[in-house]
Amino acid sequence: MDKQNVPVITLDGPSASGKGTIARLVSQALGFHYLDSGALYRLVALAAMKRNTDVSDEHSMVDIARHLNVSFRDSSIWLEGKDVSDEVRAEACGEYASRIAQYSALRVELLGYQRDFRKSPGLVTDGRDMGSVIFPDATLKIYLTASEEERALRRHKQLMEKGINASIADLIQALRARDERDSSRSTSPLQQCEDACLLDTTGLSIDQVVSRVLNMYAEARKA
């Protein structure tokens, strides 16, 4: 199958909107490949941290990305042959990832890498510019969001499960700062595409959201 004919579902949205969990489950339901684009920036950030490289050095971040040795195996993420699934989800790693994601040269470097994930029978991907920049011809584009309180509660639950204490108020402030940074960057800012379907997951269970996405995809395939 020609790559351009391979179906793609993109789920974009702010941090802690649930897009990663939903994208992974939808990909499993459809038997599609899965790309966690945010993990790529986290992996670059993690690699920089491990090498004690200054993340404010854009050239160094591009060089790290160019030689990045990563793989996604089921629900685990590997860097240089080591399972870094937990490390890459650490709050510090996420903060650094948000900073380096503003580097236009880095985004260009990772562009082709991400598009190479488009393989038969299909791809489900989540991020912040998947529908607007990486896969503008996607079969279905969804902008996933939720209230600040709901997103903070989800992040709090994730942290508590890892034994990390955090206050809801602090998490809301952190999410606001992250949203501002992601939405105001000059290159590929976080925004809803004109042709993306808005899906507010506030008050919905994971199963309900997955079901809605699958129904939306079925309708998109008919069009």
Swiss-Prot record:
Protein's name in the database: Cytidylate kinase
Binding-site positions, ATP: 13-21
EC identifiers of the protein: 2.7.4.25
Keywords: ATP-binding, Cytoplasm, Kinase, Nucleotide-binding, Transferase
Origin: domain of life: Bacteria
GO biological process, one term: nucleobase-containing small molecule interconversion
GO CC annotation terms, alphabetical: cytosol
Principal location class: cytoplasm
HAMAP family per the UniProt record, alphabetical: Cytidyl_kinase_type1
Catalyzed reaction equations: CMP + ATP = CDP + ADP; dCMP + ATP = dCDP + ADP
EC class name: transferase
Pfam families: Cytidylate_kin (PF02224)
SUPFAM superfamilies reported for this sequence: P-loop containing nucleoside triphosphate hydrolases
Molecular-function annotations in GO: ATP binding; CMP kinase activity; dCMP kinase activity
UniProt family annotation: Belongs to the cytidylate kinase family. Type 1 subfamily.
Entries under Gene3D superfamilies matching the protein: P-loop containing nucleotide triphosphate hydrolases
Subcellular location as annotated: Cytoplasm
